Amino acid sequence: DRPTGRLHIGHYFGSIQKRVEMQNSGLYDPYILIADVQALTDNFNNPEKVRKNVREVAMDYLSCGIDPEKTTIYIQSMIPETAELTVFYSNLVTIARLERNPTVKTEIAQKRDIFGESVTYGFLGYPVSQAADITTFSGELVPVGEDQLPLIEQCREIVRKFNSIYGDVLIEPQAVLSSGKRIKGLDGNEKMGKSLGNAIYLSDSEEEITKKVMSAVTDPNRIRKDDLGNPDVCMVAYYHNLFSKKEEY
């Protein structure tokens, strides 16, 4: 995860829940990356923010059940080999292919206030860096949210091209989807995000969570308390369904 702020429940259902499950199965040798170098691609003017949040992200991992005795947590900038691989992989990917990546296209559109009409090479090329992160440790299974699938596919393309030139050196990774889908924000937006201001953070206090849930979007057609509401457009009902057992919902 990128240390640009505290992690939220979208991160939990998107990948952390699956990571904890795989860790506790005893069948895998898990590695978790704190991607501080990647975080600088759109926070280049605020390195202190990235440095500070490395610790915050690590604490969020621990609070969710990531066990350092079973899982290796590492910081991207402390593994120089990934930077080396990124340079090699950059020769295998065209600018046009990076621009077609759906995840990258969406994120660039969301960051117009940072980049304007001209995105930096560093940000456009972060899928190449991500491929290096995965293959440095011969990653076979990568827990991701649904919106991250195009990044894994691009990594697989890089691996195939590299192997076609240099022989079967790299492992082609597989995405492991969490059981949950992309988590909606408090405002009803299809994605919860730090930059969107619609997130419930894993480290929020009980009072903060209560305040946020009380302000969440509900059915606008439910005017009176005893009116029947539509749970499909009520974020309170949506979160209740996420966290409660079936018989409680």
Predicted regions and their residues:
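N-terminal Rossmann-like or analogous alpha/beta NTP/dinucleotide-binding catalytic cores
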Residues: 3-131
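Active-site cores that bind ATP or allylic diphosphates and position pyrophosphate for catalysis
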Residues: 105-249
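Short, histidine-centered active-site or binding-site loop motifs used for metal coordination
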Residues: 1-3, 36-38, 140-141, 196
